[in-house]
Amino acid sequence: MTVPQAQPEINEPSPAMIGLIDDERIKNAESEPGNWLAYGRTYEEQRFSPLTQINKSNVADLGVAWYKDMGTNRALESTPIVVDDIMFFTTSWSRVYAVSALTGEELWFYDPKVPREWGRRACCDVVNRGVAVYKGKVYVASLDGRLIALNAATGEKVWEVDTITDRDRFYTITGAPRVANGKVFIGNGGAEYGVRGYVTAYDAENGDQVWRFFTVPGDPALPFENPQMEMAAKTWKGGEWWKVGGGGTVWNSIVYDPDFNQLYLGVGNGSPWTRVIRSPGGGDNLFLSSIVALDADTGAYKWHYQTTPGDNWDYTAVQDMALADMEVDGVDRKVLLQAPKNGFFYVLDRSDGELLRANPFATVTWASEVDLVTGRPVENPELDYTENAKWVLPGPLGAHNWQAMSVDVDAGLVYLPAQDNPLIYEMVDTWKETGIYKRNPGGWNTGLEFGRITQILLDNFDEQPTPKGYLKAFDPLTGEDRWVIEIPHYWNGGVLGTSGGLVFHGDALGMFTAYDKENGEILWQYNTYTSMLAPPITFEAEGVQYVSILTGTGGGDLFSGEPLPPVAEHASLTYNNSGRLLVFKLGGAVELSVPNHRDRSIPAQDLTQVNDSAIARGELHYNEYCGFCHGLVVRSGGAIADLRQMNDATHEVFNQIVIDGIYGSKGMAGFADVLTPSQADDIHQFVRARANQDREVSLGNMKPELAQLTWQ
């Protein structure tokens, strides 16, 4: 549903004029600040807008100009592209929309028809972070690994190419393509499922492959693709990493640097996460958790910097990178800025990768510091979890994830969504008992014990650091905070800064807020009634400045489920996970209706077939295969169906859903390749038992602290 205000007269552009973004236009984006031409607005990806019509003096008058219901309750993570009064963006399942930026009127819609069963292959939801627009085409990468070029005027497909090298492996794509020099660049995800990462460049005109760069070495018995892979293989020792994939996927940040004609890749975690399994002889495991610079035209290696040598915690370096010119220690430098998962904020010289700064921006316990001489972190040996479980900060969601930051070069600050979100790491039981790790081709491959995760958490609950989120103004050179806003939930949205003196941010509580960039004071706030992950953008159309944001949570936090301890104000749990595009302007007067509270009642459970041994077995299988979407202890986080609320009809066909995949067309694929009907029965009994416990609590028949969470 689109609800505009009184619609201005629109001068429709001719089809030949739509989407005509080229390299020069992006390089000179500052000359047309009303457009948002690229993923991070410019090639530098600072996500800081020079627009000032909306500013500190009048932001209190901001209101909804129009909105569009997107018809999904899955997470929305897209950064829209706005050019010449047309907005291009994506939603779940890689669907693409082109709408009028003034009214929200839909111009065209494209559905790549991703098989819904492919959702099982995605570690972290069926999300998509956006498109690239270039020379009259719109480029989108689909969840199932296709790169598709669309006519920007009509949405018709121009060409399509399969980017996946091995379709027996669980590759996915959720990231936005980047464009430069007549090429489209795209990576992929899937490290948890045992894949080998790479980035490919395609000809933007016809989709022909130009070059491909692998981020980790393959089988050393085979010829290496280039000298860098031969060099990297020497840093993997004692294991058969190529059989479990190795990881190193580039699932988010790819940045083009016109100053050096370089392409920077943000490389992900190892597969499995645990290095003692992946590379038992030690080694840095290049290029995991690294920033890699390539020649943008040829894909030739230039330099790299590894943020977390021998990654052991899922500390990706795929988080957004920004480029800037800054004075560092009295010298003008062209720098790259990144706040990856590991909790240190890196400032690198873009010419050669020299480390200039590495200051912690959140609570970090895995390392004491980064040695600026060696460039390496100083690990904390007391948190080695090879023998015993250890709480570590950050956990695998990181001190900062993919949610965008904003770089204010003039102020020397970064407006950063950060988090303290720990995990207790413990080696998988089978490896501890036998010293042998068996890859699971149909599930996650972390090397950690997830089957018993609830019991492990409860056994160590008193030692758990408190999870929380932050929005902060951070000085990357000094490591100091200018100001900090604490947010009760850790999983919040991206950030936009503007020359109007404002910082915009959406959070898990459903609040879209404008802060004073000088001191963090709240100047304006709007309740969207839906938790947010996506970054805001701002643009100008017909002389009017707008601010927009997509609503809807999910993504990598699906496994955490309902927050523990509870966060009463969590919007998508309180109301619904309503996917919307909201667009604001000064004087906007469209009103959103206040939604009803979500029905969270749990039906009575049939416990006649339930027994403790079946429940205990079911818990292990649930945590291995179901919990990553449906939530820890069967408590959904709001984006995926809450299994405690299944009705009698769904209970009747439970095994047909889980084994046969009768809901495959809805995104719930079958698991016959990894589960037996008997094991599905056990999962069913665990779900019933957990539902019954929480129902008794909700009826006041049991104190919350007495609810049984585990049967291990």
Specify the residue positions occupied by each region the protein language model found.
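Gly/Gly-Pro-rich "capping" loops immediately C-terminal to redox-active cysteine motifs
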Residues: 619, 631-664, 669-671
